[in-house]
UniProtKB/Swiss-Prot annotation:
Name this protein carries in UniProt: Eukaryotic translation initiation factor 3 subunit E
A GO biological process held by the record: formation of cytoplasmic translation initiation complex
Organism of provenance: Drosophila grimshawi
Cellular compartments per GO CC: eukaryotic 43S preinitiation complex; eukaryotic 48S preinitiation complex; eukaryotic translation initiation factor 3 complex, eIF3e; intracellular membrane-bounded organelle
Annotated gene: eIF3-S6
Claim: Cytoplasm is one of the keywords in the record: yes
Length: 434
């Protein structure tokens, strides 16, 4: 199903190193030609200092017998450069060890003063630490790189020319080492920096677009990610605007998060509005499944789209782990919507809508009623399911109103900020003529 594969477009917004897991994942699928994929990986890895990975990829392409001398020499050069950078950072190595062991001081200024007093710390050392962190990252030594990147974050001023690069590098390294808790902290820190920085409109849009793509990797691997992705992508106007303007394909991941998050069903109404608005720029089986079910009430169409959704998710690196959960929750959505309309239905009819056998459907419904505490009854003799009324709980109503008010407040705050900037700019321009 290459027509629905987003790897090519997603990789445009990811760091080179973050693309490798996606490309290796595709190698295990039969979407693209294996030879072409490996050649693309080789071309990409050649732009890094991961020489062993380059050699391994050449072996997979049956090019190991013709290992070029310059590659062997390049490995030697990389090791020599790494040694040189480590020597430059040697005076503050003990300080980074302290940070590794979690003994860092909370106050950045106090820590810098201690460095200057105990380790004769100079500005040149910070530049060396930054270069070493970047070089370690390029070599694929992400774990060690995070130590120096953390050191840079503690010591650097947010006004430093390399501060933003360090934020991005730290997030990438934590993602690649699968440290999801720390990655979420770094993601939040980077988002706050981008939202408060004095970027131009275009620069801010570009930064947010990149952050959106990187954050998908974090959100679908962190326990709290399913709530956070909805809050950030759907209820933060600046990020929703970035999705609608630059990357509507991200709707796939937002829609998936809403489907598998039973506690955020209140977000469905807002999601459907956005899907309808963006349907002319982006559609896939996941967004079409929701349209069929909640806009057109086309249950046959929803059933067919759910089958396509399984293939799409199975071949998408970001959400493949959600496959079983998605199918289960999508069936629940079909069940709830169908019963809400018809109130009394036959089990055989419901089994057809859910792509299940009648006896499987009956067991599924029994477990659903028991576990989810749905107000429904099964008449086994007649083969009927009778739904009771499902009033919206006060808690759900409150959450829905809070989300709506939060979104409107952020939108108004954004308008006020833009008008204020425009007014200040006009005021500044008027002084040019005096």
């Amino acid at each position: 199903m290459a027509q629905f594969d987003l790897t090519r477009i997603n990789c445009q917004y990811l760091d080179r190193h973050l693309t490798f897991p996606l490309l290796e994942f595709l190698c295990g699928k039969e979407i693209y030609n294996q030879q072409d994929l490996l050649e693309y990986i080789l071309d990409t890895v050649n732009k890094t200092n991961m020489i062993d990975y380059t050699m391994d990829t050449r072996k997979r392409l049956n090019l190991s017998q013709d290992m070029p001398d310059e590659l062997v020499q390049r490995k030697s050069d990389v090791l020599a450069t790494l040694k040189q950078l480590q020597n430059e950072v040697a005076p503050i190595m003990k300080a980074t060890d302290i940070l590794k062991n979690g003994e860092s001081m909370k106050d950045s200024k106090t820590f810098v003063n201690a460095l200057q007093k105990d380790y004769n710390f100079k500005v040149e050392h910070l530049e060396s630490a930054y270069k070493l962190a970047k070089y370690l990252y390029e070599c694929g030594n992400y774990q060690e790189s995070t130590s120096y990147l953390y050191f840079c974050l503690i010591v650097m001023s947010p006004n430093d020319k390399n501060y933003l690069n360090v934020l991005w590098g730290k997030l990438a390294a934590e993602i690649l080492t699968l440290n999801w808790n720390t990655a979420l902290e770094d993601l939040t820190r980077l988002r706050d920096y981008i939202d408060s920085a004095n970027f131009s409109t275009i620069q801010a849009l570009q930064q947010r677009t990149w952050l959106i793509h990187w954050s998908v990797l974090v959100f679908f691997n962190h326990p709290k990610g399913r709530d956070l992705i909805i809050e950030m992508f759907l209820y933060k106007p600046l990020y929703l605007n970035a999705i609608q303007t630059m990357c509507p394909h991200i709707m796939r991941y937002l829609a998936t998060a809403v489907v598998i998050n039973r506690t955020r069903r209140n977000a469905l109404k807002d999601l459907i509005k956005v899907i309808q608005q963006e349907s002319y720029t982006y559609r896939d089986p996941i967004t079409e499944f929701l349209e069929c079910l909640y806009v057109n009430f086309d249950f046959e169409g929803a059933r067919l789209k759910l089958h396509e959704c399984q293939t799409v998710i199975l071949n998408d690196f970001f959400i493949v782990a959600c496959l079983n959960e998605f199918v289960e929750d999508a069936r629940l959505m079909i069940f709830e919507t169908f019963c809400r309309i018809h109130q009394c239905i036959t089990i055989s009819m419901l089994a057809d809508k859910l792509n299940m056998k009648p006896n499987e459907a009956e067991c599924w419904i029994v477990n659903l009623i028991r576990n989810a505490r749905l107000n429904a009854k099964i008449d086994s003799k007649l083969g009927h399911v009778v739904m009771g009324t499902q009033p919206l709980s006060p808690y759900q109503q409150l959450v829905e109103k809070i989300d709506s008010l939060s979104m409107r407040s952020e939108h108004l705050a954004g308008l006020i900020e833009r008008k204020s900037k425009q007014k200040n700019q006009e005021s500044a321009d008027s002084w040019k003529y005096y």
